[in-house]
Amino acid sequence: IEKAGTTLENETVLGDLVIAESVGEGNVTLKNVTVLGSVIVKGGGANSVYFDGVRVGGAVRLEKEGVHLRLRGDTALERVEIGLPCRITRDSTFEGALGALVIDLAKESAKEIQIEVPAKRVELLSRTNVALNADVETLRIDRDAEGAQLDIKRGVMVGELSIDARVALTGSGLVVSLVVSVSGVTVSGSLTVEKTGTEGGAKAPTTSGGSSGGSSGGSYVPVKIVTGAAAVPDV
């Protein structure tokens, strides 16, 4: 797709689909489209790429800084890869969840990545700032994400959060189970952590601004993303 304003509807793409750089900041809409390969997004702006009833067999690769991917209807994405800061949101008709969301930036950026769609699994592989405004079953922060910040918004729940790098956890959401393998992790006092564990001799996270409500004991009940719920409002 090379032109802004393009709508692709009721089609099956046998290979990869590329939204080209020539789209610029323009709009592109995919409606009732099945892509057997991957979708590579190189064009589009802050309010421009819409997936409505889209199914992708491979990955959706977001390679344009500042692009906004908006999900609608029964869109089903098993894997989304973020290569540059962007935003992923949903409207009230989207009732699913991303299978896997992998954040691995091609270059370091101070700009925030905004995730407003539920996901079964999230992997943060590089240093960046992430605002999480939807539930996640499991989230892993890799050692290469040293210095990253994860802002878990109010009303958002992360089931299992494992951390292998010195990062900052902020926000006022809920983490059911937190496990750290390095010392130096900080947790905002407004964030609720039900259970905290350490591995490899790491020190427990330090808390600022009050109590996180955490506990080193108790049992963990896995969180399951239930589709069909209403969209989480922006905070």
Question: Which residues does each PLM region occupy?
Answer:
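Ser/Thr/Gly/Pro-rich low-complexity, disordered linker/stalk segments of secreted
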Residues: 178-181, 187-233
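Short, T/G/N/S-enriched strand-turn elements that build extracellular solenoid repeat scaffolds
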Residues: 1-177, 183-195, 203-205
